[in-house]
C-alpha cells in the first residue's frame, strides 16, 4: 500500500504557492534528529509536548534505523518533499502498526501548522493510518491543517470550502476524514537549504509513482538522534 500525504488534484497543489523561508526558532529541550542525505545534511526538531504519540513513533523508527537507506520518493516543488518508506529499489519497507492521528490535539496545545519548513506525518485517506512516512512542507499548505470544529451539538453553523452547513451533529464533523488534516510534529532547524535543493531536483516516473519521483535518487544515508 502506498502511503501518500494527500489526495488532491494538481490544480489544488498549484494553489499552495512557495513562500520565502522565515528564520525558525528553536526549543531548548526538544529532541533533534540529524538526517544525512546524498543532497546534504539537515536537522529537524520534534515536539513531544504537542504530539507525543507521533513523536515517539517517529523517534522509534529513527532508533531502529528504519530511515537509513530510504529515499525521498515524492517531490513536488510547490508543495512538499516526502520520504521514509521506500528503499532505492522502490521496495516499501515493513512498518509497525499505524498510530492515532494527533493533529487537532497538537493544534489545541499550540502546535505548529503546515507551513514552510515544518514536518508532518504522511498517511492514506484514513486519518489513523500514519506509520513511518513523513513529509517536509516547502510551501505554506494551510489546506493540510486540521479543521477546527466549533462548539455546540449540533453545531449551529459550520463553513467549509465556501459552503455553509447548519445544525450538523458534532460527532459527524469530528469523524469526517477530510477535516482531520495532517499532524505536524516538528520542523527543520538547520539545513533548510538542503531541503530546498531536494525540492528542485528533476522528477518523473519512478517505482509505483507515475510522476514526482526524483530522477536522481535522493538517499537518506542515516537518521540519528543527536539530542
What are these model-predicted stretches?
Residues 2-6, 24-227:
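Cyclophilin-like peptidyl-prolyl cis-trans isomerases
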Residues 8-14, 19:
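N-terminal export leaders
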Amino acid at each position: 500500500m502506498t502511503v501518500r500525504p494527500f489526495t488532491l488534484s494538481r490544480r489544488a497543489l498549484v494553489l499552495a504557492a512557495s513562500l520565502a523561508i522565515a528564520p525558525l526558532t528553536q526549543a531548548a529541550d526538544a529532541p533533534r534528529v540529524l538526517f544525512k542525505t546524498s543532497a546534504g545534511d539537515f536537522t529537524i526538531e520534534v515536539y513531544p509536548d504537542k504530539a507525543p504519540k507521533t513523536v515517539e513513533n517517529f523517534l522509534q523508527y529513527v532508533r531502529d534505523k528504519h530511515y537509513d537507506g530510504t529515499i525521498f520518493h515524492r517531490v513536488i516543488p510547490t508543495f512538499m518533499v516526502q520520504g521514509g518508506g521506500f528503499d532505492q529499489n522502490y521496495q516499501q519497507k515493513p512498518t509497525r502498526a499505524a498510530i492515532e492521528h494527533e493533529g487537532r490535539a497538537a493544534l489545541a496545545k499550540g502546535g505548529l501548522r503546515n507551513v514552510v519548513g515544518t514536518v508532518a506525518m504522511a498517511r492514506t485517506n484514513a486519518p489513523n493510518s500514519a506509520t513511518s512516512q513523513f513529509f517536509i512542507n516547502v510551501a505554506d499548505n494551510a489546506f493540510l491543517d486540521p479543521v477546527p470544529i466549533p462548539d455546540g451539538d449540533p453545531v449551529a453553523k459550520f463553513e467549509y470550502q465556501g459552503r455553509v452547513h447548519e445544525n450538523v451533529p458534532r460527532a459527524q464533523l469530528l469523524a469526517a476524514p477530510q477535516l482531520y488534516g495532517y499532524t505536524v510534529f516538528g520542523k527543520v532547524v538547520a539545513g533548510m537549504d538542503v531541503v530546498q535543493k531536494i525540492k528542485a531536483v528533476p522528477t518523473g516516473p519512478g517505482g509505483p509513482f507515475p510522476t514526482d519521483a526524483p530522477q536522481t535518487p535522493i538517499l537518506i544515508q542515516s537518521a540519528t538522534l543527536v539530542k
